[in-house]
Amino acid sequence: MLDQATIDSLRHNNVAPAGHLIDGVSDTSGAGEQIEVISPIDGTRLTTLADGDEAIVARAVAVARAAFEDGHWSKMAPAARKAVMHRWADLVQANAAELAVLGVRDNGTEIGMAFRAEPGSAAATLRYYAEVCDKIYGEVAPTPDGILGMIHKEPVGVVGAIIPWNFPLMIGAWKLGPALACGNSVVIKPGESASLSLLRMCELAHEAGLPPGVLNVVTGRGETVGEAMSLSMDIDVMVFTGSGPVGRRIMSNAAASNLKRTYLELGGKSANIVFADTPDFDAAVAGADGRQ
């Protein structure tokens, strides 16, 4: 349970300047000025965020590729990958209050929804894909006598992921869970207005035992970081949740670069709008945060 005392103890914590997470190390370098993180709750400056560029993306992708090729994760025994992902889910659950409150301060999600739909859902997703690790089977194809045809499933390589601002932990886990369970390395870009909780969740992955370089976070703007990722010649798959126009851009860049595979979830907004003349404001608030 998330009680008011816990919320109050976390909501005023200072937030250190946030940077990329590359090769297991935080890095606040960027293209120039840092992005100011403004809390939507009261408009105050919360912290700063590293503004990545093409060079930062190239470094993160190179680190991810090297980690994939060295095999510490991609060739790890499936049962061992499973154990790491379960430990990660445990840490997400254990730090749920911190993650939820950090997310609220960063992107303004209502606290009840943030607690249920963010760390809770993310941990459940990671547990689901942890169980997938040792349950991926190949096939024996039907062939004529004297011929043996086998289908062997292997990780694809480096996965690039771009997620939006609204549910960074939940949507982040949707991207990270399957990619990591199958042995891939990942470079992920969170929304520049909602990066803090995702960064913290990825730090917890390293605490759980994920080898350095397997999971890398590059913060910054879509027009620079996202563009560089979708044009990278060394990212094998791009996954994206966001707008239709940006999805089209990613597909175009994928075709113009290395014909990388793309998996897109496009469009959709579900805002809660309460008008000034609402007859029962308290009921509207209770409905918005799931209490009725």
Enumerate the predicted regions with their spans.
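Conserved small-residue-rich beta-alpha loop and adjacent elements
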Residues: 138-212
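A structured beta-alpha segment of the ubiquitous adenosine-cofactor-binding alpha/beta core
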Residues: 148-149, 216-236
